[in-house]
């Protein structure tokens, strides 16, 4: 090519390199298609591994499930079967165990009791549960799962967490503890202000509702729970008016647009979704999977009081993102009913907070 007029030696080398790369990629696509892999997926695999894809597929095709978006356990297992990987392969069993945990997360669970995990994996993989106990330990050694002893009714055994969910739970608990800063405003002064709010709004607060306001004033974190008709909305309104009289900045939010609209209608104050409150960037609201929030520990919310309604619908990932954006000194009030709609994502956050 360098002999062709107008093509320098450097340009000729670049053209030759590109042609060789295209030839190599074409060969890789033909190789992958033997195992039922589409061209689109093949391009992703080649982009990730290059010419190393041959050794990856030969040694451990289950790496695809971890490394390539769009390749789950099922596809990797199908490829492994075509290549001739044994059904009791260590790679297959460990990948299958992680897949069972991911299915549980899709159903809202951040962990499974080990016996349940092994039983489900046995059904999926066709391998005896007892033969897979060592693989659970191997995953724990690799920090891909975390084991935590727990009581499950009449038995005690390890709960098996995917590592990410374990640390989300741990981090959430730590941040809630840090936020729960007590103050000591005199109860008599709080009650006098509540008398003023009652008179102004021509309402009568029950003693339990007054106590909730007192707790909100004197604690960094408060949970208000109860079924429909138990006075949660009246209590929230009293809390809002109390802090408004103190000149504090109050933010209201809920997990979904519909819940935020109901909160606005019930209180008369503007509420947003949690995603909008945290300034979701680049993704659709009501889906926190992989979301990037502009509000975080480096750019926290500038609020004195944050009230979150419909907490039963908040999953562990969204809760972690919310707490990361709340400064110590901000009062956080969580409102909800554990018997209402659960979160779509993993983690029964409201119930766990109440139980703790």
What are these regions (language model features)?
Residues 1-356:
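Conserved ATP-binding/catalytic motifs of P-loop helicase motor domains
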């Amino acid at each position: 090519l360098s002999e062709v007029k107008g093509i320098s030696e450097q340009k000729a080398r670049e053209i030759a390199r590109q042609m060789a790369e295209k030839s190599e990629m074409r060969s890789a696509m033909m190789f992958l298609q033997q195992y039922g892999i589409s061209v689109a997926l093949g391009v992703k695999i080649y982009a990730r591994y290059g010419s190393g894809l041959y050794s990856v597929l030969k040694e451990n095709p289950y790496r695809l499930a971890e490394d390539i978006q769009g390749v789950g356990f099922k596809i990797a297992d199908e490829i492994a079967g075509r290549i001739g990987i044994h059904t009791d392969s260590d790679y297959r069993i460990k990948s299958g165990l992680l897949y069972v945990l991911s299915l549980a997360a899709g159903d809202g669970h951040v962990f499974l009791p080990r016996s349940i995990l092994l039983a489900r994996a046995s059904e999926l993989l066709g391998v005896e549960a007892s033969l897979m106990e060592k693989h659970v330990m191997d995953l724990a050694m690799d920090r891909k799962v975390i084991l935590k002893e727990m009581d499950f009714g009449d038995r005690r055994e390890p709960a098996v967490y995917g590592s990410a969910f374990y640390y989300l739970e741990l981090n959430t608990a730590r941040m809630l503890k840090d936020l729960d800063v007590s103050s000591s405003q005199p109860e008599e002064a709080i009650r006098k202000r509540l008398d003023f709010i009652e008179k102004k709004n021509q309402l009568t607060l029950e003693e339990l509702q007054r106590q909730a306001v007192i707790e909100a004033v004197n604690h960094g974190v408060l949970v208000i729970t109860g079924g429909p008709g138990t006075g949660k909305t009246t209590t929230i309104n009293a809390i809002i008016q109390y802090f408004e009289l103190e000149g504090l900045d109050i933010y209201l939010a809920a997990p979904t647009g519909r819940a935020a609209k109901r909160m606005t209608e019930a209180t008369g104050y503007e509420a947003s979704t949690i995603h909008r409150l945290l300034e979701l960037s680049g993704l659709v609201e009501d889906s926190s999977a992989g979301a990037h929030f502009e509000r975080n520990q480096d750019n926290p919310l500038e609020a004195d009081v944050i009230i979150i309604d419909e907490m039963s619908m908040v999953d562990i990932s969204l809760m972690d993102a919310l707490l990361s954006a709340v400064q110590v000194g901000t009062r956080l009030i969580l409102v909800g009913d554990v018997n209402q709609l659960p979160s779509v994502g993993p983690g029964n956050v409201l119930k766990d907070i109440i139980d703790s």
